[in-house]
Amino acid sequence: MTELFIDGAWVAGSGPVFASRNPGTDAIAWQGASASAADVERAVASARRAFAGWSALDFDARCEIVKRFAALLTERKEALAAAIGRETGKPLWEARTEVAAMAAKVAISIQAYHERTGEKRQDMADGVAVLRHRPHGVVAVFGPYNFPGHLPNGHIVPALIAGNTVVFKPSELAPGVARATVEVWHEAGLPAGVLNLVQGEKDTGIALANHRQIDGLFFTGSSDTGTLLHKQFGGRPEIVLALEMGGNNPLVIGAVEDIDAAVHHTIQSAFLSAGQRCTCARRIFVPQGAHGERFLARLVDVTSKITADVFDADPQPFMGAVISARAAAKLVDAQARLIEQGARPIIEMTQRDARLGFVNASIIDVTDVARLPDEEHFGPLAQIVRYARFDEAIERANDTAFGLSAGLLSDDAHAWEQFRRTIRAGIVNWNRPTNGASSAAPFGGTGRSGNHRPSAYYAADYCAYPMASVESTQLSLPASLSPGLHF
């Protein structure tokens, strides 16, 4: 089987065989050999050879290839959505939106290069000052499993537009989606070596991250893995390291007239994608008193009716399975540990089948947990924290090392002003779900949530470096010489 894409051709991997599974059925979704260290070496060497030609190619010519990629994505939307659903458990309705987002990033990325990078000129006394942007060279892109098409392309598209070449290491849990995406890139007309795919598990990732011939590493994934990468590159300032990681995101419920709207946005924040979005709300702050009780009762009522099913079920469910049976068991275990520390389950999470990734949307009151662990539970596990004062809610919301997203649901504009001034997060929403974001705005956080903004627009900032020039078309002796010089 040809699992890897190196130097413009599909080739067999020489590492251990691994497989991905449909988390809703346990059927094998993809199987093949991983990339060995030698395979990674060939992929990086291929990207290095291709860099000179690709970076020298006219910018508009590079953009035409990327635009063809977007057009092909639109043509193959259903097939790609099925691949995403089969491997991640994500319902088809949601997988279709992921493919659409992949295509939409292209136009924004091209616009971003012109507006944020590109070339700018300013006249000066003896010539002109010019700001240009140059690609870094060979960049490694590490993709996550939760959006295996959309999120890696948030790095790949702007990297290619800027003139870099890429070695792509997808999540070992979604290799089939990666292959399908790279096939589209190949058909779009990318020259050999410009994009290389290395499939594999931990050893493949280590071989790529440790390679001395990469100029940048762009990563979307867990904070633990991103932190290890950051430590690994300590003392190597020549490497451009862009990290987009997780969050322990707060959603604060304030004074609202429309309880159903607040409940809807809370469910979208906590349970969309089965809670497997880095921007999902993990901690929901609910006021004490009658208003909070009404909100919580309605939240429990609607949440209890949410079903999870296979990706292609008819009718479509709100949630699919989480990525694996192991991930489901880990969530149930996290709930058990919280209960041991004093939490009170309101809707208890259970794993439907030990072989599958199905868990129910769950709600647990952690108000009485003395030392609430600052962890990202990556799934539909909503933690309720009751608060007496709005200041207290903000203080506790900020009690995290993460800083990705935060939200306030409130009719009070003054409360919003206070919230946005004092909350510590990169994405802060008002009367919208915490996971609502635009590709034309910065996407990313602060603290343990990362150090760059890998949306289509702001990714341009780290995909090229600025080069400043002072230029004159005519070489001439200046009219005024420095003291001590005689001509």
Curated annotation (Swiss-Prot):
InterPro entries documented for this protein: Ald_DH/histidinol_DH, Ald_DH_C, Ald_DH_CS_CYS, Ald_DH_CS_GLU, Ald_DH_N, Aldehyde_DH_dom, SuccinylGlu_semiald_DH_AstD
GO molecular function annotation: succinylglutamate-semialdehyde dehydrogenase activity
Active site: 244, 278
EC number: 1.2.1.71
Function: Catalyzes the NAD-dependent reduction of succinylglutamate semialdehyde into succinylglutamate.
Superkingdom field: Bacteria
Enzyme class: oxidoreductase
Pathway info: Amino-acid degradation; L-arginine degradation via AST pathway; L-glutamate and succinate from L-arginine: step 4/5
Annotated binding of NAD(+), by residue: 221-226
A single GO BP: arginine catabolic process to succinate
HAMAP family cross-referenced by the UniProt entry: Aldedh_AstD (MF_01174)
Catalytic activity: N-succinyl-L-glutamate 5-semialdehyde + NAD(+) + H2O = N-succinyl-L-glutamate + NADH + 2 H(+)
Keywords attached to this entry: Arginine metabolism, NAD, Oxidoreductase
Annotated family: Belongs to the aldehyde dehydrogenase family. AstD subfamily.
Pfam families, per the entry: Aldedh
Protein name: N-succinylglutamate 5-semialdehyde dehydrogenase
Source organism (scientific name): Burkholderia vietnamiensis (strain G4 / LMG 22486) (Burkholderia cepacia (strain R1808))
Organism classification: Bacteria, Pseudomonadati, Pseudomonadota, Betaproteobacteria, Burkholderiales
